[in-house]
Amino acid sequence: MSSIRNLSFLLLSLLVIACGSNPQPEQAAGPDSLLIKAQELARRFIITDGHVDLPYMLQEKKVTISEATRDTLLSTSMGEFDHARAVKGGLDAPFMSIYIPVKDQAAPGYGMALADSLINQVEAIVRVLPEKFALAGTPDDIRRNTTEGKISLPMGMENGAPVGKDIARLQYLFDRGIRYITLTHNKDNQICDASNDTTHTWKGLSPFGRKVVAEMNRLGIMVDISHVDDSTFYQVMRLSKAPAIASHSSGRHFA
C-alpha cells in the first residue's frame, strides 16, 4: 500500500511541476518547413506501403507488361502508382496487392489462377524494368534494392481464398513471393469471417483457418487482419505466435 501511495505522490508532484512550469508556446511550423522535414525523413528512412492495387488494376485495364507497355510503369495518369511518383514521394517498398475478389473465391480453384496471373504481372514488371524495380522477400532484399536505387516490390495477397482447402498451398504461395495474406475480403470464406458479412459463418476463424494461421507463422507469412470481423481479430491475436498486421486499415476503417 505504501508503494502505491509513494507512486501517487510522485505522479502528483510531476503534474504540479508540469502545470507550474508555464513553457512558452512554440512557433507553429509553416507548410514549407513541414514539407522540407517530410522530404528529409523520406530520404533518411526506408518507406513501405502495405497495399498497392497495381497488379489487379493492370488486369482490369487489360494491360500486359512488356517492352511496349513499360512506360505505363514509369509515369502514367492511370491508377495510383508509377515509378516517377514513387521516387518523388520517397516510397521504397510498396507491397503489390494480389487481390482476389469475392466472385473468384467461390469459383473452382478458389481464385488461384487469378493469384498466379497477378504474381506473373509483378514478375514481368521486374523483367521489363530491372534497373528500376526488384522483387523482395526479406528486409535484407529491400535494403539491398534501396542501396542500388531500385524500388522493391514485395507481395501480399488480399483474400486467403486461393489457399482452398489445401494447407500445402501456403508453401506454394510463399515460394511465389507472397509475404502476407489478408485472411478474407468482403465476405466470409473458408478461413474466417469478414467484417462486411453479417452471416458469421464461423464465429471467427474456421477450424481450417486456425491451421492456416499456424502454418503462416511457421512459413513466415504475415497474418493480415484487415477486412476480418471482430471475432476473427481476437482469435488471431490469441493464436498467432507472430505479430499480425493491418495492411490497409485502422481500427474500424479501411485506408
Positions of PLM-derived features:
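Bacterial N-terminal signal peptides that target proteins for export
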Residues: M1-S8
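Bacterial N-terminal signal peptides
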Residues: S8-I17
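N-terminal hydrophobic targeting/anchoring segments and the immediately downstream early-domain regions
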Residues: G20-H200, F254
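Catalytic metal-binding/acid-base residues of hydrolase active sites
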Residues: D53-P55, D229, S250
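Glycine-enriched alpha-helix->loop->beta-strand junction motifs that scaffold or abut catalytic
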Residues: G90, I178-Y180, L239-I245, S250
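Active-site glycine- and acidic-residue-rich loops that bind
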Residues: G160-G164, I221-V228, R252-A255
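Generic beta-strand/beta-sheet core signal
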Residues: T184, S226, S247-S249
